[in-house]
């Protein structure tokens, strides 16, 4: 009986180890949920060409509309007052008076920087995908649609830089996600870049109202021309 039990244990140990390592491998060998798979994408399937554009809209909605970041911008004009007591969220009081030296550790300002560059990074990836789709397009209508989609993405990238340059002045101008050596560009260069991007958007976006778009609410020529 003892020998039988010993044999069963010796047989069970490697089996259990095999199952354990196999299940762990299956569990761990997965792409992170926030990772977009770039291998194996069929860029000849033009029906999927809008997918990277849709991702930029989702990113812009989540990262450019933050109340905390937006507050840093609007309190600097005459449209909105901070309100509340003088000590309530006093950082917005500093922002309204352009006292940026007192905002170096303000979490909302740091968040706006990160949010805008996340939109830039997402836009760069989307534009790279659109370029890959464009290589396989043959009809003029499809090429025009590809240019329109690129214009939608470039609008959001330009808008992110509009926020950055207005709050920080000189900022790095990143036009792709491959750049390793990053340096600040002058405020004048960034603003010229924004104007050039908007010119491209105006030339390639449809002259319709947003509710008339194939994707209702999408940016149009009039959005870029405002």
Roles of regions detected by a PLM:
Residues 1-33:
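Bacterial Sec-dependent N-terminal signal peptides
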Residues 29, 78-82, 88, 170, ...:
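Acidic side chains
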Residues 30-31, 165-175:
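Short, well-structured active-site flanking segments
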Residues 33, 65, 69, 135, ...:
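Secondary-structure boundary/capping residues
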Residues 34-38, 139-143, 173-180:
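Short linear capping/connector segments at secondary-structure termini
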Residues 39-43, 47, 67-87, 205-226:
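Short, surface-exposed recognition loops and adjoining beta-strand edges that mediate ligand/DNA contacts
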Residues 46-54, 58-63, 87-168, 180-192, ...:
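Conserved, well-structured interaction surfaces
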